[in-house]
Design a protein with these regions (language model features):
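SAM-dependent transferase fold signal centered on methyltransferase-like domains
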Residues: 1-176
Length: 176
């Protein structure tokens, strides 16, 4: 077994269709418990998944306005949305790296910091141990046009010795 693998395919069960995006917009202010209880009214819709998306979007509305406005972005969990950096904080962190650096984010999470660092970096390697976070990050990076990011699903302690040389490591672990 390899110590890590590069995520190449996005899980189809996490994909947002045009109907999903519209549903999320239409129900953004709804009571989420009631929405879950009325799931039978929406055949063909994965209501638990969509409720999770609405809950996560509520978490990021103020701190990630550009991501909130982009209906194509996926959020793997509400906790990821709670713990992620704000756009303002991520932009500040971006100023701490040099132009054209290669960077490795050892604690990828939702990918906010990775995305902002990638706007300045030559290449960024995003490492995250949770597969769903990796799948969502790969999807979101693609939607955002961040083509200089490699997504790696691995435990950081195992993967770090196998990584190519980089100019900087970034680490901001979950605090829960």
């Amino acid at each position: 077994h390899p110590l890590f693998y590069v995520v190449t395919d996005f899980s189809a069960d996490m994909e947002l269709t045009t109907a999903h995006i519209q549903f999320i917009k239409e129900h953004a202010a709804d009571d989420l418990a009631r929405l879950l209880l009325s799931a039978a009214k929406y055949p063909g819709m994965d209501i638990p998944f969509l409720v999770d998306q609405i809950a996560a979007r509520r978490q990021i509305r103020e701190k990630l306005p550009s991501w909130y406005e982009n209906g194509q972005l996926i959020f793997p969990t509400k906790i990821a949305a709670e713990q992620c950096s704000s756009e303002q904080t991520a932009a500040y962190k971006q100023e701490l790296i040099g132009e054209s650096w290669t960077v490795c984010d050892l604690t990828g999470g939702l990918g906010i910091d990775s995305y902002f660092l990638s706007l300045k970096a030559k290449h960024l390697t995003y490492i995250e141990r949770f597969p769903a976070y990796c799948e969502a990050a790969k999807h979101n990076f693609s939607v955002l046009g961040a083509n200089n990011i490699t997504v790696v699903n691995a435990d950081t302690a195992q993967a770090v010795d196998t990584l190519p040389e980089v100019d900087a490591f970034y680490i901001d672990p979950a605090r829960r």
